[in-house]
Amino acid sequence: MLKVFNPSPVQVGSIECLQSAQNWQRKSLSLQGLNLLQSVLIKLTTGKISITTSSGEYITASGPMLIFLAKDQTIHITMEETHEQLNYHLIELDSASIKNAYNFFLYEHADFSAPLTKPTTKHLLAPIETGVARVFNLLHSSNKSQKLSQDKKEYLIRFLLSEFIYEPEAFALF
């Protein structure tokens, strides 16, 4: 079933409202019409998240889960507590960092191949493996304090995006 979207008149470039929503102390929270101007990486530690996109995709994930949402789409997002309090963090990924990761995976590693097809989805999901949560937290905290160089940030982004590279849609979304 497709839902009708009424995007907000103001584009949300920095999705700070989603970042600060975690502090609202509610059992569930819905935000509608968020326009993603950049790709977003979400680390869902606990809780449940449901996302409906403007293209009609419906995504449901429970923590712990890593979620990649491609840019240039409008989403409706609902977050809920499950047995534990909702806990998530997100990082906006600029296009240059994603392009650098794409080039690294495609040109420096011969065992990866990029399909030449248009993606049918605009999201990727991956369970949070050992070390991924720590790298995500390091990158998340460094974005706030600006304590890492751009080269180190891009290296950490490549590490995080490597969780998705075996998905058929990954290269088309990067």
Q: At which residue positions do the language-model features occur?
A:
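Intrinsic disorder/low-structure terminal segments
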Residues: 4, 67, 170-173
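An amphipathic alpha-helical interaction segment
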Residues: 120-174
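Short Lys/Arg-enriched alpha/beta "domain-start" segment
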Residues: 1-11
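Intrinsic low-complexity, intrinsically disordered segments enriched in polar/basic residues
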Residues: 1, 54, 58-59, 143-147
